[in-house]
A protein has these predicted regions:
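Active-site Tyr-X1-5-Lys
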Residues: 132-156
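C-terminal amphipathic/interface module of NAD(P)-dependent oxidoreductases
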Residues: 211, 227, 243, 265-298
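A conserved pocket-lining segment of Rossmann-fold NAD(P)-dependent short-chain dehydrogenase/reductase
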Residues: 174-201
Length: 298
């Protein structure tokens, strides 16, 4: 089987390549940079224009579209424009390429649970409606999904994905760093829900989706056990052998996230309580179902 991964040169992409290549699949990575990715052929593209050099690879492939800049940045208009453009432009280009050079047998379109905005205690399923939330969250996600609406493929799955817990990612590195400095208390009330998935379960879930042809449309790729922020921080302190730390007030998060960490405070102050209904109904088993299991390897 040929698997084409757009945006597959990042941390998560490289682990996906390793997994799929080990299974004997042919893996092609589309990257804006001329880099080496073990287990894959790397084809350079600009994400904006169609070239036969890479577009011909789409015919009868499994296409996984991971394209997009990290959300871990201050939410200025310029940065939000970048977040949206880095997702929408490559997706539009892939849609055009599939029309011109050949239809993938499966289109896996990355998306995010942030499409639901700040959902409070509401339990979110694949039937839940997107929210009119902050543009950098719900707005970008809706534009991203809309760009793939006319994708030409035999089967298409929109992967509304939780926070992927993977060592080495910027957001998790920051949480580990501040917790090691004895600053790992809950954020604000600590009641905001965190939907998450261990990166190994994320990879296994994609494998499962590829093989189960009854899965299509929106699929939540998230652990069945979301936790509140206060639980996440407690388990992180436990994993790193740190004592209780005082809560961080919301106003300090709003200032500190922007000034000290150059990131979006809403990443910590908003939450979503999602469940992977379709995966559970099809019998998918999560190996890392509890947050303490996922944090053991930090």
């Amino acid at each position: 089987m040929k698997i084409v991964i757009a945006g597959g040169a990042g941390t998560l992409g490289r682990d996906l390549v390793k997994h799929f290549a080990t299974q004997g699949n042919e893996v092609v990575v589309l990257s804006r940079r001329n880099v080496s990715v073990e287990g894959a052929r790397v084809l350079v593209w600009d994400g904006r224009s169609v070239s036969e050099d890479w577009a011909r690879e789409l015919q009868d492939s499994v296409l996984l579209n991971l394209s997009g800049e990290l959300v871990d940045r201050v939410p200025t208009k310029a940065n939000i424009d970048l977040l949206e453009r880095s997702r929408v432009e490559p997706t539009n280009t892939l849609v055009q390429a599939a029309r011109q050079f050949g239809t993938p047998k499966l289109w896996l379109q990355m998306s995010t649970l942030a499409i639901y905005g700040d959902a409070g205690d509401q339990i979110l399923t694949e039937a839940s409606l997107p929210a009119n939330g902050p543009r950098q969250m719900a707005g970008v996600a809706k534009a991203w999904e809309a760009a793939s609406a006319d994708a030409s493929s035999i089967r298409k799955v929109i992967l509304r994905t939780a926070v992927v817990l993977q060592p080495g990612t910027p957001a998790l590195n920051r949480l580990v760093r501040i917790t090691k400095l004895f600053l790992g208390g809950q954020v604000a009330s600590g009641k905001q829900w965190v939907s998450w998935i261990d990166y190994r379960d994320f990879i296994r879930a994609l494998d499962f989706i590829m093989k189960d042809e009854s899965l299509n449309g929106i699929v939540h790729v998230t652990s069945p056990n979301p936790v509140q922020n206060k639980t996440l921080m407690r388990e992180l302190r436990r994993a790193l052998e740190r004592p209780w730390s005082p809560p961080t007030p919301a106003f300090l998060i709003r200032v500190g996230a922007r000034v000290l960490f150059r990131t979006d405070p809403l990443l910590a102050l908003t939450g979503r309580r999602a469940t992977p209904m379709k995966l559970l109904e099809r019998g998918f088993h999560f190996q890392f179902g509890s947050i303490d299991q996922a944090l053991k390897d930090l």
